């Protein structure tokens, strides 16, 4: 087994963050409109079962809920399961849409993405048929985090913080999981911001620092970084209103059809990565892995994004991430809810196809191991459990 593709570190510049923003779901739509159906729909040849295979993995160390991907890169669990002579190359996607674009172009074979790009990736089978094969994680405060400017009033409860948003200036990267969450909360609570802005994370950071924004909705690990830098405060999360967020693994149907042996092998390794993530004794090791595969984040902020406890008065939870692996009822509910939102946003033409969800591989693997979904949880740990610098 060979391992290729060192992750090149990049400085956190305006170019980096602008790329993050421009890779929103809109880029998927633009990409789909700009490529030829005949060439894009052509199946990639993956060889015969048992043959060595060259895989390109798109993953997101900048989205905490999908960190089984960065664990996989570091621990190389796949070496135990893939055919001998196979190679694996990891490519960072600053946002899920970049990974989806690569998969639609036939350049990425396995994708670790958030709920919105994961669902959007399945919406144009005439371009390339992409399926969801596993649930990376579900949470209430991974993508769904309300931040306010640091000089905002102190709130005794998340409800108070949410009420304060009425008539305020709020920003999100629109089309993202944060946008879906914010709009759901505003509708449920009859909150009407004076302005609801579509901004990149960099612009949101600058706006909060300069006092030009009252609030924003941001995902982890960026939320923990902004809080630790004193740029913002947490006031509420999905736990405050029972709104979930999630991450999914996607693969092209061509790989599933041609190489079920490889799909099973990768998902066996994924189970190892998920169980490693769930074990609290590995928390510091996972934070170190994340620090080695990202730039612009302290190890402490990365640790906090996955494992750090937050007061319940700020939307904190006892479980930071539930690790379903398989397709639980909660995961299916999120898929349907997010799918409807994307249709309303005109990001996808119709709700998700039933065949776009492929539960059999994870179901068979869980049965073989005597496990049921969810297979684990990433529990919130007190700050003193962080033992790094």
For every predicted segment, state its role.
Residues 1-54, 372-389:
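Short, low-complexity disordered leader/linker segments with a strong preference
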Residues 73, 77, 83, 104-108, ...:
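Sec-exported extracytoplasmic/periplasmic mature domains
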Residues 196-197, 202-299:
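Pocket-lining segment of extracytoplasmic ligand-binding domains
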Residues 41-190, 195-199, 214-217, 243, ...:
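Short, glycine-/small- and polar/acidic-enriched structural segments
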Residues 335-389:
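Conserved C-terminal helix/tail region of periplasmic/extracytoplasmic solute-binding proteins
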Residues 258-350:
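Secondary-structure end/capping motifs
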Residues 62-65, 168-172, 212-213, 252-256, ...:
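Second-shell loop/turn segments in exported
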Residues 75, 100, 104, 115-118, ...:
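Extracytoplasmic/secreted envelope proteins and their assembly/folding machinery
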